[in-house]
């Protein structure tokens, strides 16, 4: 069948004509087209087809062996089709070369090679070694042409810049050095490949059925019937005398024969395949086909009647016979099953009759006991048979190993025997030569040394042959590895380009959806609370948008990375709000974050990961500072945070210190334990690790906070420490590491008294923030002062928990990356548009949740708003601390004076005085 398809490869309507570039040396190169340009000038003018006869190993049972097949290549699909002869109308099957690799073994039979695809391994054999190498090189070339034919990804430039000339020449020189280890181009074997091979007689087998494909029997019958009809039509036209053969064309003329719609599935019913449409131009060739003994079933063809009606009747009868045969088999199987059921019923009936025939209960009980004993005996027998089966299986395994060893031994003996036969042949030739050419001197008998020398020389000849075979195999495998690697790189580039394109389109889709939701929100605000038809429609659209899940969009496989419910650290990507407006805002924010992540993945995150991977050991440096400001990838963040924490608490750490603090809590309860227990359930209610009942994070957080309470009795526990420790736990995952991270933040990074009872340093930082905002954002502060907005109501908690409750997780952790290394050192226009203090407070409360571009935030913080020199921060803190302490001291004095005045006045109601109520009562 492949043969038919091979000729069909010449048709422009089915398989396009395959081209075989051949060098002046007469063979194609194994190298890709761009590497074989040096041979381009000597290529033949006319392209050659890749087709010819090869032996394919296959079959089952007694007919398993080598079968002659006609192979031809389809350039459109990069498939290698094969049929029984070159004249068959439809191929038997095809081999997908786009994902295949080729192999030839030095110890295999001459001309044998393999095509390995992901689904199977096809073993083929050529007539000679030269033909095998030609096929392998041509298949490599065709595979490379198929992979290199599509245009390169847009990211790759079409031409190298002029400045890259030396680099390009160096790469070409390196490639030329690599090509020295490859096979040289093989000349085209005359008459064995190409269109001329179709004119050669088909290789025959001793048995007629040995060359038939039983796996594709329907296709074989279809090809046979087509050949018979074609032969009759050719004979009916009366071209020339019957005994005269028409002239043969240079190529089989079958350009008008269509191929099946899907050659990869040749096992379809013949009725489903397209019918051949012979033309008058094919008459001469069809007459020639009739002369050749290439029919699949010669005896079957002779027995057919002359009329088409008889053929159809025979086919119908054959199908009816097959149907009746299947029905007979099913009836026999049904009879067998019914027979077994009848036997079981009879046995049950006999047992029941015996049971009912018993006169007394004792007899019946004895029958039951007898059956129980039989069941027990049968169970023991089954166990014994099972043990026997296992022992037999072990014995069979040992026998199999012995058989394999004996087979290897027999193979060694056969090889030795072959070597001895070769020695005998050489010695016989030498004896014949000695008899025909008698020596002038008497022959000297061979000694032991001479015999050893001859045997060594013979071994050397064999080793040279083996070495040459392995050298050829090695060169071919080098070229195969080289080409497969280049194909893999090209496919990887294409895949990367497609993934980038998909991510870009998905990001654009998220942006469009976000704009749609934002538009709905603006329409809702414009509609107000009016109960109109349009407002009802807006409400329905909003509910549908909020209920829409990303999983529905990815059901058809279009969306590659849908918005998940939780992020990588367990935080909700879309927070749950009770108010519908806030739900809509949360959905818009989730879409914007997802869109930004997709757009920044290839352009920002991948280069950043590469820089972190190449960083090596961590050490304080400007480069590390820049990398921390750019953000730490998730896979590197635990290692980096541990190093940053250790850098700050190295002088405080000691082996077993954390366990010692935990043991103190087991001896007696800390006064802050009750408050810690109350705050555990309020820690990050939007994180699944702290809300799931089976999670271990709450227990870890409890132990970390209790240990810190014992570590720093001055502070003990303060609200807000639970969030700091929770962030450390989510990233570091280890209790002790999270504990030392909390110690580093409270005792080394933050100023003293930041978490004390008076929160002195926290209040100082609020005043420092006011000064910095007056310096950096004077318009904003003037606007806030106009409406008497106090930022400390919001920013106080931001600073106390280092934005743990304010920012989304991916931006929060980037802030912490820089915070742990550098210590304590957006939306202005939106705030300036607000003209009401209540609106400003509401906006400031939620605007941190709307920040989705971490890169923009870091740029504003470290570039636009810079500098924030630590010297200036210390001076501002010192000045405000002095003022705050003076104010607190003044308040303490006023409090003391007030208490002193109150104590000097005595009780509020002196003894002997009556109230107005009492006086009225007496009157």
From Swiss-Prot:
GO biological process: positive regulation of GTPase activity
Pfam family of the protein (one): RabGAP-TBC
All residue ranges annotated as the Rab-GAP TBC domain in the record: 631-823
Domain PH: 47-144
Modified-residue entries (Phosphoserine), positions: 915
InterPro entries: PH-like_dom_sf (IPR011993), PH_domain (IPR001849), Rab-GAP-TBC_dom (IPR000195), Rab-GAP_TBC_sf (IPR035969), Rab_GAP_TBC_domain (IPR050302)
Region (Interaction with RAC1): 301-439
Database matches in Gene3D superfamilies: Pleckstrin-homology domain (PH domain)/Phosphotyrosine-binding domain (PTB), putative rabgap domain of human tbc1 domain family member 14 like domains, Ypt/Rab-GAP domain of gyp1p, domain 3
Quaternary structure and partners: Interacts with activated RAC1 and CDH1.
PANTHER family for the chain: RAB GTPASE-ACTIVATING PROTEIN 1-LIKE (PTHR47219), TBC1 DOMAIN FAMILY MEMBER 2B (PTHR47219:SF20)
Role according to the record: Acts as a GTPase-activating protein for RAB7A. Signal effector acting as a linker between RAC1 and RAB7A, leading to RAB7A inactivation and subsequent inhibition of cadherin degradation and reduced cell-cell adhesion.
Chief location of this protein within or outside the cell: cytoplasm
GO terms under cellular component: anchoring junction; cell junction; cytoplasmic vesicle
Keywords: Acetylation, Cell junction, Coiled coil, Cytoplasm, Cytoplasmic vesicle, GTPase activation, Phosphoprotein
GO MF, any single term: GTPase activator activity
Name listed for the protein in its UniProt record: TBC1 domain family member 2A
Modified residues (N-acetylmethionine): 1
Places the protein is found: Cytoplasm; Cytoplasmic vesicle; Cell junction
């Amino acid at each position: 069948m492949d043969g038919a398809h091979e000729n069909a490869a010449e048709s422009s309507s089915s398989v396009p004509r395959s081209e075989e570039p051949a060098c002046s040396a007469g063979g194609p190169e194994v190298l890709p087209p761009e590497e074989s340009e040096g041979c381009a000038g000597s290529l033949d003018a006319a392209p050659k087809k890749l087709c010819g006869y090869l032996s394919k190993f296959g079959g089952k049972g007694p007919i398993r062996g080598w079968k002659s097949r006609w192979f031809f290549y389809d350039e459109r699909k990069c498939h290698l089709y094969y049929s029984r002869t070159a004249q068959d109308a439809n191929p038997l099957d095809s081999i997908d070369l786009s994902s295949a690799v080729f192999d030839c073994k030095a110890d295999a039979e001459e001309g044998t090679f393999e095509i390995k695809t992901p689904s199977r391994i096809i073993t083929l054999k050529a007539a000679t070694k030269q033909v095998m190498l030609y096929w392998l090189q041509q298949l490599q070339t065709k595979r490379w042409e198929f992979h290199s034919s599509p245009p390169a990804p847009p990211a790759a430039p079409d031409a190298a810049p002029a400045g890259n000339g030396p680099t390009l020449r160096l790469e070409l020189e390196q490639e030329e050095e690599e090509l020295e280890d490859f096979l040289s181009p093989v000349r085209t074997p005359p008459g064995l490949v190409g269109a001329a091979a179709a004119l050669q007689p088909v290789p025959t087998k001793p048995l007629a059925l040995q060359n038939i494909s039983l796996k594709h029997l329907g296709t074989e019958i279809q090809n046979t019937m087509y050949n018979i009809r074609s032969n009759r039509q050719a004979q009916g036209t009366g071209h020339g005398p019957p005994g005269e053969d028409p002239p043969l064309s240079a190529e089989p003329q079958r350009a008008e024969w269509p191929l099946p719609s899907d050659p990869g599935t040749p096992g379809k019913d013949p009725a489903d395949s397209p019918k051949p449409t012979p033309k008058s131009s094919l008459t001469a060739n069809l007459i020639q086909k009739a002369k050749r003994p290439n029919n699949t079933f010669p005896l079957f063809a002779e027995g057919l009647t002359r009329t088409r009606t008889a053929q159809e009747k025979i086919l119908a009868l054959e199908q009816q016979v097959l149907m009746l045969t299947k029905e007979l088999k099913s009836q026999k199987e049904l009879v067998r099953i019914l027979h077994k059921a009848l036997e079981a019923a009879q046995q049950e009936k006999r047992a029941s009759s015996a049971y009912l025939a018993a006169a007394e209960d004792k007899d019946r009980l004895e029958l039951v006991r007898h059956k129980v004993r039989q069941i027990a005996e049968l169970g023991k027998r089954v166990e014994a048979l099972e043990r026997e089966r296992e022992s037999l299986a072990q014995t069979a395994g040992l026998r199999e190993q012995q058989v394999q060893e004996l087979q290897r031994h027999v193979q060694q003996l056969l090889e030795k025997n072959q070597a001895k036969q070769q020695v005998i042949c050489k010695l016989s030739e030498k004896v014949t030569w000695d008899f025909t050419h008698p020596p002038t001197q008497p022959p000297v008998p061979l000694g032991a040394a001479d015999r050893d020398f001859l045997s060594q020389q013979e071994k050397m000849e064999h080793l040279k042959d083996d070495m040459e075979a392995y050298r050829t195999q090695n060169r071919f495998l080098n070229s195969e590895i080289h080409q497969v690697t280049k194909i893999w790189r090209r496919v990887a580039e294409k895949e990367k380009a497609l993934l980038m394109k998909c991510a870009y389109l998905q990001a654009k889709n998220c942006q469009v959806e976000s704009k749609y939701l934002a538009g709905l929100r603006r329409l809702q605000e414009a509609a107000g609370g009016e109960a109109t038809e349009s407002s009802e429609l807006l409400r329905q659209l909003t509910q549908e948008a909020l209920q829409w899940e990303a999983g529905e969009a990815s059901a058809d496989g279009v969306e590659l990375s849908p918005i998940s419910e939780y992020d990588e650290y367990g935080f909700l990507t879309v927070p749950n709000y009770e108010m519908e407006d806030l739900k809509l805002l949360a959905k818009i924010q989730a879409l914007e974050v997802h869109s930004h992540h997709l757009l920044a993945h290839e352009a920002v995150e991948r280069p950043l990961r590469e820089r972190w991977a190449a960083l090596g050991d961590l050490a304080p440096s400007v480069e590390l500072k820049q990398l921390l400001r750019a953000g730490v990838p998730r896979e590197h963040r635990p290692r980096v945070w541990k190093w940053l924490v250790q850098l700050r608490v190295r002088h405080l750490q000691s082996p077993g210190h954390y366990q010692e603090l935990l043991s103190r809590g087991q001896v007696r309860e800390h006064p802050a334990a009750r408050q810690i227990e109350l705050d555990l359930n309020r820690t990050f209610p939007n994180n699944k690790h702290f809300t799931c009942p089976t999670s271990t994070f709450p227990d870890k957080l409890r132990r970390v906070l209790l240990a810190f309470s014992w570590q720093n009795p001055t502070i003990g526990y303060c609200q807000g420490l639970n969030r700091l420790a929770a962030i450390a736990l989510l990233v570091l995952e280890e209790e002790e590491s999270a504990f030392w991270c909390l110690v580093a933040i409270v005792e080394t990074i933050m100023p003293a008294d930041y978490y004390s009872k008076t929160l002195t340093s926290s209040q100082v930082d609020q005043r420092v923030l006011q000064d910095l905002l007056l310096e950096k954002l004077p318009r904003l502060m003037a606007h806030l002062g106009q409406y008497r907005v106090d930022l400390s109501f919001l920013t106080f908690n931001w600073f106390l928990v280092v934005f743990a409750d304010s920012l989304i997780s991916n931006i929060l952790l980037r802030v912490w990356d820089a915070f742990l290394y550098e210590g304590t050192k957006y939306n202005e226009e939106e705030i300036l548009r607000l003209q009401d203090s209540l609106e400003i407070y509401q906006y400031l409360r939620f605007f941190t949740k709307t920040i989705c571009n971490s890169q923009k935030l870091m740029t504003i913080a470290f570039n636009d708003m810079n500098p924030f020199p630590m010297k200036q921060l210390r001076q501002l803190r010192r000045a405000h601390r002095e003022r705050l302490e003076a104010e607190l001291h003044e308040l303490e004095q006023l409090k003391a004076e007030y208490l002193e005045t109150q104590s000097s006045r005595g009780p509020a109601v002196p003894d002997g005085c009556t109230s107005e109520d009492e006086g009225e009562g007496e009157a």
